[in-house]
Amino acid sequence: MPKSVLLPLVAGFCLSVASAEHLRWALDGAQDRIDVIRQGDCHLRLVRADGQTVPKGSVYSLRQTRHEFNFGGSLAADWEVPKRDWYPEFKNRFANLFNYATIDFYWAVHANQHGKWNYRADSREKLDWANKQGMRLRGHPLMWHEVVPEWIASSERPVKDLDQDIMAHVRMLVEDYPEIDEWDLYNETPGIRLKAADMGVRRWVESHGGPGPVTEVIVDAVREIQPDGRFIVNHFAENDPEFQQQIEDCLSYEVPFDAIGIQAHMHHFGDVFTEKRLWGVLERFSKYGKPLHLSEISILSCEIFPDWPKLSLWEKEIAAAKETGKPTPCKPSTPKWEQYQAELAHDFYTLAFSHPAVESIIWWTITDLEPWRGMPAGLLDAEGQAKPVYHALDQLINHEWKTLIEATTAEDGRTQFRGFYGSYTVTLQQEGETLTGEFDLRPDPLEVQNVVLRVAHGRG
């Protein structure tokens, strides 16, 4: 991120962030917007399996079981968690919050021989578990220059050979993992300019004309395999002119990508979002006419670095420790910073959920166990216990933004309500039987939706 962009932001954070106090956002109009764009009216007719409508005055309960909106978490990090005895509880806590999961497909992690892909068992287990839970799955990524094997990073291989390998890899992922609903295309494509000029993958990107054209090449290839797939451009710096140019190039050439991913890793003051900054980013990118994903969210529960140079020195210290086999330095999560994390997450999610262009919010590292950059940003601590931020998000996602109703039917088994978009179950007692049915509330609902009720538990 350019220093000229960072400096004005830093000044605005020094007092509040340095003291581990979050200045609560005004959130003016946020609740009204949520009421309008995330909820809708629903008209139902409750019908028994034999075709008879339930009598007028029948008491029923409605419970939302799933959000239409993507509340997501990453399973592409937290590498050590599956080795812990509390891994089952980790999964329970994850499933309690999220209906959407990011799954890792880092090339260099799963391939150590040219031409051979060996997907790790722990990644496969996470993918299968999330799929069984009915979560929407995001593959991360089809391509990323930070995690390519040595034969793709090579400064000596001809571009035509690189092109053959890269495109074969991209096609293989989409073809072999049809259960993945969405894919990050080439993750953080504009960042390739920060790599050595002779790096293989950089030479490959530049041979196609840069981030925009290479996005078109990848999209065209994967659309042949998965015409109805969803494919996302994603970057770490929303104010990077080359990211905006990539999007504009894709739109100009009518490249059929589906959404824009914006990351928000807040490891130093310049990367911490204010209310004004977040709303401005969402407004600016919504003008492109694509759904927005806040694709990687990190809010720290430890002391934050004042600027990128200080964070960079810290990262070098971590790298040096790993090279020499010394313990990796890690900042402590503290109660004050955990409160800061919870309050900022509450406000960040509320404002984002209130913007009509946003369809996904995805938290990055779920636990503080061996955290990325040695800086805890988890919803759970290093022992898998819920932190204040977990409870803050649970209150929003599972209580404030979820519909639970008890009411009575009118004539002909009819009823109506207003609720959050998503999936529902309806339950009522009749003649000693528990009857239950399911339905979805969508932004384009049927005029009247028949819900067939069937015996759930027999008599009792």
Predicted regions and their residues:
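Substrate-binding cleft and catalytic face of glycoside hydrolase catalytic domains
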Residues: 96, 100-116, 123-231, 236
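Alpha-helical scaffolding within the catalytic cores
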Residues: 58, 79-92, 121-126, 168-173, ...
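Aromatic-rich peripheral "rim/lid" segments of glycoside hydrolase catalytic domains that contact
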Residues: 184, 189-221, 277-291, 300-459
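Aromatic- and acid-rich polysaccharide-binding/catalytic face
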Residues: 95-108, 113, 180-187, 191, ...
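Beta-strand-rich domain onsets/edges
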Residues: 21-78, 112-113, 138, 152, ...
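Short Pro-Gly-centered beta-turn/loop motif in secreted/extracellular proteins
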Residues: 83-97, 415-423
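Bacterial N-terminal signal peptides
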Residues: 7-16
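Bacterial N-terminal signal peptides that target proteins for export
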Residues: 1-7
